[in-house]
Amino acid sequence: MLAALVKVLNADTVVEIGTHTGAGCLALKAGQNPSGKIFTYDVISWDQLGVPSLLTTEHFDGGGIVQLIGDLSKDAFFEENLEKLNSADLIFMDAPKDGIFEYKMLDQLAKLENKKGRLLVIDDIRFVNMIDFWRQISSPKLDATGFGHWSGTGLVDLSDGLSFARP
């Protein structure tokens, strides 16, 4: 589903929040034009995780993937990366699912400039601690779980910004 979304949107710039083993990143890249860029963010480098990664150095050396290490929920790091984030056609959020980080990220993503056709894809919206989070988003959205990940896939239209309520 991720590759298809990137392809249909013709997403030249993709932001992934939460690299982990790279499965999502590689799925996103599979649907992208060869000239496209993926900026993938995590607090730990892909090669320092301590678990096997699907990523290799070739993905980063001219492969169109750039990993940035830091916490996007923190104001300073978010501001440092604002230009990359504002250029994104698609943002894939596949991060901790602790019920705290996600709300911090919504606060941050609400600061982005409006961009017609920009889509936010949120993974695991059916996890018990993500259900209320998903319900708080009032921007146009679609629960695409039937087409996406078994644990839930949410699509949010960010064309006119992001609206949500805090619990």
Model-derived features: where do they sit?
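S-adenosylmethionine/decaboxylated-SAM
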Residues: A3-P167
